[in-house]
Design a protein with these regions (language model features):
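Amphipathic, interaction-prone secondary-structure segments
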Residues: 2-31
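Residue-identity detector for glutamine
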Residues: 7, 12, 38, 65-66
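Intrinsically disordered, low-complexity regulatory segments enriched in Ser/Thr/Pro
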Residues: 22-47
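Mixed-charge, Lys/Arg-enriched low-complexity segments
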Residues: 39-81
């Protein structure tokens, strides 16, 4: 049985009043993010910080009904805002 999912999943989450579409898939035992894009017309009015990325990861884990440890950390260069 393979635990690698080749299908990319898109999940929409809301963090700090902004809506984000997260593209990623499960690879091995963890869910990995490939791209995060901001949805909506409002420009982001603060920088992408490690704290913000942790909030995004927590919201993503909740949306996927997974433990936060099962979602890999999100790199800042994967976020389009």
């Amino acid at each position: 049985m393979s635990i690698y999912n080749k299908q990319t999943t898109r999940v929409q989450v809301e963090v700090d009043g902004y809506t984000w579409r997260v593209h990623g898939r499960r690879h091995g035992l963890r869910w990995h993010v490939h791209l995060v894009e901001q949805i909506g017309l409002l420009p982001l009015d603060y920088p992408i910080t490690p704290r913000f990325r942790d909030k995004l990861r927590t919201a993503l884990a909740k949306a996927l009904e997974m433990d936060e440890s099962e979602v890999a950390r999100i790199s800042a260069d994967l976020i389009l805002a």
